[in-house]
Amino acid sequence: MKNVLIIFGKPYCSICENVSEAVEELKSEYDILHVDILSFFLKDGDSSMLGDVKRGTLIGNFAAHLSNYIVSIFKYNPQTKQMAFVDINKSLDFTKTDKSLVNLEILKSEIEKATYGVWPPVTE
């Protein structure tokens, strides 16, 4: 069973689309799940299944810890049911305007280094 990369992006965001396209190159190693963050957090979105308290906590955590990320990536281990935050910002080159803005070697390293169960995310 492969680990899963969960990509939280925004609609109509070219950087998010380019990151998603670049990460697709890792699909032989990971299952990849793309999540539209706005639809996810809408009142009737998928996050509503968590209940109001957990949903509110999740929204608060996103706002407090991930608001400076254009796109967020988590890796998920379906066997242990643990998640880890992947610091994608280290792999991005914002001078590029296509999927090459993601340095896949750096991203792979960040995915491997991401520690399960650590929250809030440790960023350098």
Curated annotation (Swiss-Prot):
Q: Where are the transmembrane segments?
A: none
InterPro entries named in the record:
Glutaredoxin-like (IPR008554), Thioredoxin-like_sf (IPR036249)
Gene3D superfamilies from the UniProt entry: Glutaredoxin
| Protein localization | Host cytoplasm
Induction (UniProt): Expressed in the intermediate phase of the viral replicative cycle.
GO CC terms in record:
host cell cytoplasm
Record family assignment? Belongs to the glutaredoxin family.
Q: What does this protein do?
A: Glutaredoxin necessary for virion morphogenesis and virus replication. Functions as a thiol-disulfide transfer protein between membrane-associated OPG128 and substrates OPG095 or OPG053. The complete pathway for formation of disulfide bonds in intracellular virion membrane proteins sequentially involves oxidation of OPG072, OPG128 and OPG088. Exhibit thioltransferase and dehydroascorbate reductase activities in vitro.
Identification of the protein by name: Glutaredoxin-2
Q: Which organism is it from?
A: Monkeypox virus
Q: What does the organism's lineage look like at the top?
A: Viruses, Varidnaviria, Bamfordvirae, Nucleocytoviricota, Pokkesviricetes
Gene behind this protein: OPG088
